[in-house]
From Swiss-Prot:
UniProt function note: Oxidoreductase; part of the gene cluster that mediates the biosynthesis of the bianthraquinone cladofulvin, a conidial pigment not required for virulence but that plays a role in fitness and resistance to environmental stresses including UV light and low-temperature stress. The pathway begins with the synthesis of atrochrysone thioester by the polyketide synthase (PKS) claG. The atrochrysone carboxyl ACP thioesterase claF then breaks the thioester bond and releases the atrochrysone carboxylic acid from claG.
Signal peptide residues on this chain, from the entry's feature table: none
Key words, A-Z: Monooxygenase, Oxidoreductase
UniProt source species: Passalora fulva
Name of the protein described by the UniProt record: Oxidoreductase claK
Native organism taxonomy: Eukaryota, Fungi, Dikarya, Ascomycota, Pezizomycotina
Protein EC: 1.-.-.-
Gene Ontology molecular function terms on file: monooxygenase activity
A Pfam family of this chain: NAD_binding_10
Underlying gene: claK
Length: 270
């Protein structure tokens, strides 16, 4: 591999965050992307320019295909974990199952060995989580709003908390950065800043992903093993369409889980 080329793996490439990561990395000529997704056709519809791009290699399959996942993450600097949902699905395990599968594959590749094994040092992981479940980052949110948000995505947050707990248990050999933004919006780039102290919202997915790349690339590892928020710069992103409906559907799923089968899916920022 060309020593000047840096390769990143994006898990969940067809989501808002995953696709924004790919778009930002395409703007860095020395970057290569291993895009992991369940549906290659969907990814090509979202980002048609990657069809003929030498910067992007698509890995189509599920997280339980360990050979495919291993090929995707080998020789990468960082693995962006963006597999989640905006729907408050009862019993949600997307983040947990992704973390468990990824760590198992990394162990199989020998990354847990003191010298990193034959495949070299382990890539950093960047888990897309939420500032809502971090008391320090969310300390300035109005208490009523925080109460509502925690319940409207309770199943998703429980999944994220367990995934984080699992990844923190691997920190003797594995470096994870926990990305915890506030509200997210499908909007243009407006500028961003990384913070260890507070969340400001909303921020666009393009700015969120740019901040994630900056954290992954930091030569001093200042963000390693930390909870960080990617905040808007001087101009906040537009208020995300669909937020109110997403919260209402999430509250129904929290208090009446049996209604899940009858409620619409695909909620969240538009």
């Amino acid at each position: 591999m060309d020593s000047k080329v840096t390769t990143y793996a994006v898990l969940g490439s067809t989501g808002n965050c995953g696709s924004a990561l790919i778009r930002n990395l395409l703007g860095k000529p020395q970057s290569r992307v291993h895009a992991f997704c369940r549906n290659k056709k969907k990814l090509l519809r979202l980002i048609p320019e990657i069809a003929d791009s030498k910067q992007v290699e698509v890995f189509e399959g599920g997280m339980q295909d360990h050979d495919l996942l291993a090929a995707c993450i080998k020789n990468t600097r960082a693995v962006f974990m963006c597999i989640s949902t905006n729907d408050n699905v009862p019993g949600c395990r997307l983040s947990q199952d992704s973390a468990i599968a990824l760590v198992k594959v990394m162990r199989e590749l020998g990354y847990d060995k003191p010298d990193g094994g034959p495949n070299g040092p382990a890539p950093k992981l960047l888990l897309l989580s939420s500032g809502t479940i971090d008391p320090h980052l969310s300390k300035h949110l109005p208490s009523l709003l925080l109460w509502i948000l925690k319940r409207s995505a309770s199943h998703v947050y429980a999944d994220l908390e367990k995934a984080e707990e699992f990844l923190r248990a691997q920190e003797s050999w594995l470096t994870t950065i926990y990305i915890k933004p506030g509200a997210l919006s499908v909007d243009k780039k407006r500028g961003y800043e990384l913070s260890l102290t507070e969340q400001k919202d909303p921020v666009s997915y393009l700015d969120l992903s740019a901040g994630m790349i900056e954290a992954a690339d930091d030569p001093e590892g200042r963000w390693d093993l930390k909870n960080i928020s990617v905040n808007c710069g001087s101009t906040p992103a537009g208020f995300p369409d669909g937020t109110i409906l997403c919260i209402l559907m999430g509250l129904l799923r929290h208090y009446f889980p049996w209604t899940h089968a009858y409620l619409p899916m695909g909620m969240g920022p538009k």
